[in-house]
């Protein structure tokens, strides 16, 4: 946005103009997230209002303590380290007891470097195992099952 002199709010409104009508409330997802210990925070390169709409569509919005969006990150996107460090310190999070779920593999690197357990959600079968990916699952449900059983 900075390099192209775009208004951040205008850009975010444009990229988040997405039809969410295909997203449905998911009682299984609600139960699995609700069973996770500790506080839950959404960390997104998107904007808070968009994240809230997605969470509401899935029926899980009341399960999250907060949303740390691109604006709270001072428009510094993942996978940069500084916004993640700021999120962790502001929320007084113990890195060693934290689990970071992500669908973009490279975004896991900073979390892993900080001692956070990393979980990559992807339907692809990567041929190369990355050292900064602790676990890989095809669905968020299977990842939540493992975390709820083992952490």
Each PLM stretch: what is its role?
Residues 9, 13-42, 48-52, 78-81:
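Short, acidic loop-to-helix structural element flanking the phosphoryl-transfer center
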Residues 3-16, 64-68:
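Short, basic/glycine-rich phosphate-binding loops at helix/coil junctions
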Residues 6, 38, 116:
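Short phosphate-binding/catalytic loops that engage adenosine nucleotides
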Residues 4-5, 28, 59, 148:
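Glycine-centered secondary-structure boundary/capping sites
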Residues 20, 34, 47-151:
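Asp-based, Mg2+/Mn2+-dependent phosphohydrolase catalytic module
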């Amino acid at each position: 946005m900075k390099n192209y002199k775009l208004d951040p709010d205008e850009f975010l409104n444009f990229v988040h103009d997405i039809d969410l009508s295909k997203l449905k409330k998911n009682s299984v997802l609600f139960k699995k997230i609700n069973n996770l210990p500790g506080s839950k925070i959404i960390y997104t390169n998107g904007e808070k209002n968009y994240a809230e709409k997605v969470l509401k569509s899935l029926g899980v919005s009341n399960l999250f303590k907060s949303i740390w969006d691109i604006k709270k990150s001072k428009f510094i996107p993942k996978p940069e380290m500084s916004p993640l460090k700021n999120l962790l310190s502001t929320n007084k999070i113990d890195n060693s007891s934290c689990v970071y779920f992500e669908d973009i593999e490279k975004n896991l690197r900073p979390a892993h470097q900080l001692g956070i357990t990393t979980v990559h959600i992807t339907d692809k079968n990567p041929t190369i195992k990355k050292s900064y990916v602790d676990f890989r699952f095809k669905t968020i449900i299977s990842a939540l099952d493992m975390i709820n059983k083992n952490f």
